[in-house]
Curated annotation (Swiss-Prot):
Domain Fibronectin type-III: start-end pairs: 144-229
InterPro entries xref list: CBD2, CBM2/CBM3_carb-bd_dom_sf, CBM2_carb-bd_dom_sf, CBM2_CS, Chitinase_II/V-like_cat, Chitinase_insertion_sf, FN3_dom, FN3_sf
PANTHER family (UniProt xref): CHITINASE (PTHR11177), CHITINASE 12-RELATED (PTHR11177:SF317)
Family: Belongs to the glycosyl hydrolase 18 family. Chitinase class II subfamily.
Gene source species: Streptomyces plicatus
Protein name as it appears in the record: Chitinase 63
Pfam families, sorted: CBM_2, fn3, Glyco_hydro_18
Taxonomic path: Bacteria, Bacillati, Actinomycetota, Actinomycetes, Kitasatosporales
Length: 610
């Protein structure tokens, strides 16, 4: 399970040239004719993904290759691809399959595997020689140092000590590895690692290097947990700290909005959480929503967060991999996988007939070994339990929602973020009254209260009304359809204020055929929009139809015969002030691509909650 305060297991590609591999090759393919390097591609706590890359560094072709290495006790390969992998106890051997054994000079090939346990490979050999191609005849590699001991552990540092390695010619220095990556090279047998994150798990091991520059096997590993953190209880105290944005997987198509845009806009440094939307709910299970956008689409170097192009054979690509890269650069960001939504909520009623089985299916998908390190939580967006959305839920009892959330908490445990997007219908007998949100709040970290889309051009003749009113105003078409009413209703049902997030739409809703500037006018239908009639991104509206007035804490605009309502940086600031006064848990928004290229709405949320 991927926990909230686990360190990002892979901040970058971990190139670990390790000493050694057994070979079935001829003398022409000995020590210096090939190299093998290991990369840990993912880590989900109880296991990891790994990749070996074999390269022909000689001047003649290789006809076959064999890689060997040792794992410490308790670490093993559970599945592999593009190589035949066998073992004798803790010694592992990988041989080429038929199609990838021949390597021309300078060519390389990779194979991958999933593993369990905390250890790293050591004693690597490629075709009988050192994996780094630097075997020295008559000079033995150093032994493994002693397993490090940890002391003086603080929120941000730890002191490591180990017993010396031995070598026939002498030990020159030691590489200190944190989570498999070298973080320091020292000549002594102690090292203090600084700049760590509080309340976070790390794993350390050490390798010795001799005077011939040969690297020996890694020591055993020691687990270290820095002090601090939240103690593992759901929603310990988010206060006004949660600043969450929805990233839509379909945005990579027509909208041409990618994870890298969060970096170039400056938004990544100003948010705390991302909800990736959407996974589907089908046949009583959580399922992938768009496999191509989620984990298959290849990114070029200029499109990628880390500036590295995807390869055809890497285990994970597309949005999942880009989000992994984003977390490596911005480790404060937590990512949740969101399931359901307006279009895909129809599967929830069947799923909650067996909440435990549904929760297990969601856990198995979110914690799939290929991307378990990407996600820190799950978000359930059921529109709506025991009520109508795109379709009507006519089979679930009022307690179905809390039963689902209870099962999710039991399956995922206390250290995993569990949230839900919920209705903001605060009217008497409305959607909030239809489900047991108060009881369910015992099991969730927070609710994303969808305080937008109260009014829109689905009522094609009007009256025109702001789609995200903070409070009521004279002439509002429906009582209880405001942010204030929704929050008051949830609180009355026992939901703690700090488990409620206010929602901001990064878009406007509008009508055409409108002659009246103030709200309440008649219309002839929805105004034209870039992707859908009646809706338009803020980044477009701020220039095409600038705000001409405010009502109920939000803005509206009358331009020509069109009438739009949307939030601006100024109205967002007032809503953030209100959220803090109410003791809410923060804010979220739908969704990133509606903002300007410099992220001015995200900036307004960020500054408003400080």
């Amino acid at each position: 399970m991927r926990f909230r305060h686990k360190a990002a297991a892979l901040a970058a590609t971990l190139a670990l040239p390790l000493a050694g591999l057994v070979g079935l090759a001829s003398p022409a393919q000995a020590a210096t004719s090939a190299t093998a390097t290991f990369q840990k591609t993912s880590d989900w706590g109880t296991g990891f993904g790994g990749k070996w890359t074999v390269k022909n560094t000689g001047t003649t072709s290789l006809s076959s290759w064999t890689v060997e290495w040792d794992f410490p006790s308790g670490t093993k390969v559970t599945s592999a691809w593009d190589a035949t992998v066998t073992n004798s106890a803790d010694h592992w051997t990988a041989k080429n399959v038929g199609w990838n054994g021949t390597l021309a000079p300078g060519a390389s090939v990779s194979f991958g595997f999933n593993g369990s346990g905390p250890g790293s490979p050591s004693g690597c050999k490629i075709n009988g020689g050192s994996c780094d191609g630097s075997s020295v005849p008559g000079d033995e590699a150093p032994s493994a140092p002693g397993t490090p001991t940890a002391s003086n552990i603080t929120d941000t540092s730890v002191k490591l000590s180990w017993s010396a390695a031995t070598d026939d010619k002498g030990v020159k220095n030691y590489d200190v590895l944190r989570d498999g990556a070298t973080v320091a090279t020292v000549t002594g047998t102690t090292y203090t690692d600084n700049g760590l994150t509080k309340g976070t798990d790390y794993s350390y091991s050490v390798k010795a290097r001799d005077t011939g520059d040969q690297t020996g096997p890694a020591s055993g590993s020691v687990k270290v947990t820095t002090t601090g953190g939240d103690g593992g209880e759901p929603n310990p105290n988010p206060g006004a700290e949660v600043k969450m944005g929805y990233f839509t997987n379909w945005g990579v198509y027509g909208r041409n909005y990618h994870v890298k845009n969060l970096v170039t806009s400056g938004s990544a440094e100003k948010i705390t959480h991302i909800n990736l939307r959407f996974g589907n709910v089908q046949g009583g299970k959580c399922t992938i929503g768009d496999a191509y956008a989620d984990y298959d689409k290849a990114y070029t170097a200029d499109q990628s967060v880390d500036g590295v192009a995807d390869t055809w054979d890497q285990p994970l690509r597309a949005n999942f991999n880009q989000l992994r890269n984003l977390k490596a650069e911005y480790p404060h960001i937590k990512i949740l996988y969101s399931f359901g939504g307006w279009t895909w909520s129809g599967g929830f009623p069947d799923a909650v007939k067996n909440p435990a089985a549904f929760a297990k299916s969601c856990h198995d998908l979110v914690e799939d070994p290929r991307w378990a390190d990407v996600f820190d939580g799950i978000d359930l967006d059921w529109e709506y339990p025991n009520a109508c959305g795109l379709s009507c839920d006519e089979t679930s009892a009022p307690n179905a929602f809390s039963s689902m959330m209870k099962a999710m908490r039991a399956e995922f445990g206390q250290d995993y973020l569990i949230t839900a997007a919920v209705t903001a219908d605060g009217s008497d007998g409305g959607k909030i009254d239809a489900a047991d949100y108060g009881e369910a709040s015992k099991y969730i970290d927070w609710y994303n209260v969808m305080t937008y889309d109260f009014f829109g051009a689905w009522a094609k003749n009007g009256p025109t009304a702001p789609h995200s009113p903070l409070n009521a105003y004279d002439g509002i078409p429906q009582q209880g359809f405001t942010t204030a009413d929704a929050m008051a209703k949830f609180k009355s049902k026992g939901v703690p204020a700090d488990k409620l997030l206010i929602g901001i739409g990064f878009y406007g809703r509008g009508w055409t055929g409108v002659t009246q500037s103030a709200p309440g006018g008649t219309a002839t239908g929805p105004a034209a929009g870039t992707y859908e009639a009646g809706i338009e991104d803020y980044k477009v509206l701020k220039n095409s139809c600038p705000a001409t007035g405010t009502v109920a804490g939000t803005a509206y605009a009358h331009c020509g015969t069109n009438w739009w309502s949307y939030d601006t940086p100024a109205t967002i600031k007032s809503k953030m002030d209100w959220a803090e006064q109410q003791g809410l848990g923060g804010a979220f928004f739908w969704e990133f691509s509606g903002d300007t290229t410099n992220g001015e709405l995200v900036s307004a949320i960020d500054s408003g909650l400080k």
